[in-house]
């Protein structure tokens, strides 16, 4: 467990591992950038650039997509090496439904577990029961119903999915706009209409009412998938994201350290076009991308999950 996680637990006056503590830890990451890293050296670059957390994995999504095959939880030694290398929180991915991979990650002391569609699903009917763990979970969603189902399972953070490993931000935009539009729709409904909405969303009525009353999710909402430039990150913040995950876009680019710092600054100053213009200068080549609309449906990672 990182120092950041220990501090969050020590500050809490209630049971460690409770929904409130988990959500509170996620809240501390708001406004930040979480970066995929595959080595301790990359983790240090991300930390020095101002990342709020790192995601430890053996292959970034672009490589997973290019190499194909079954993608699983990363090697524990690799994850442990990254935990030892940095002071910021460390996340790691488990396959959808693979509760034993999640148990291993918790035993390793990661600060957050990502039940991730980037890896090959282990269960096509059931997601992990996240209430069984003290470690908080982040899960992806393409729409509000999916987000609320994951929250009902215990997710402490939601990220709009996008299409990982492409460098194409269009799906991230679509999913964030969809989630925000569905939240706004609930906020304008009469209370008796929310019963029907809950059925349409296939989500618990109590969560639907909470979203309608508050005009937002009960957990932190980040964005992910295809974010490759400072402008991409800033746009997603404008659309309602409370923070940004960046995967292949940093360490598949020409100048990772400079691009990482630029994306952090753009995320923090997303309302200032002059800052975004300044940090976007001289970044070198962005990652070589793939247009999402050219991908066969069977190759679209965001389609995984239900």
Swiss-Prot record:
The active site is at 93 (schiff-base intermediate with d-ribose 5-phosphate). GO terms for molecular function: pyridoxal 5'-phosphate synthase (glutamine hydrolysing) activity. It comes from the Bacteria. D-glyceraldehyde 3-phosphate binds at residue 177. D-ribose 5-phosphate binds at residues 36, 165, 226, 247-248. It catalyses: aldehydo-D-ribose 5-phosphate + D-glyceraldehyde 3-phosphate + L-glutamine = pyridoxal 5'-phosphate + L-glutamate + phosphate + 3 H2O + H(+). GO terms for biological process: amino acid metabolic process; pyridoxal phosphate biosynthetic process; pyridoxine biosynthetic process. Keywords: Lyase, Pyridoxal phosphate, Schiff base. Coiled coil: none annotated. The keyword S-adenosyl-L-methionine does not apply. Belongs to the PdxS/SNZ family. This is Pyridoxal 5'-phosphate synthase subunit PdxS.
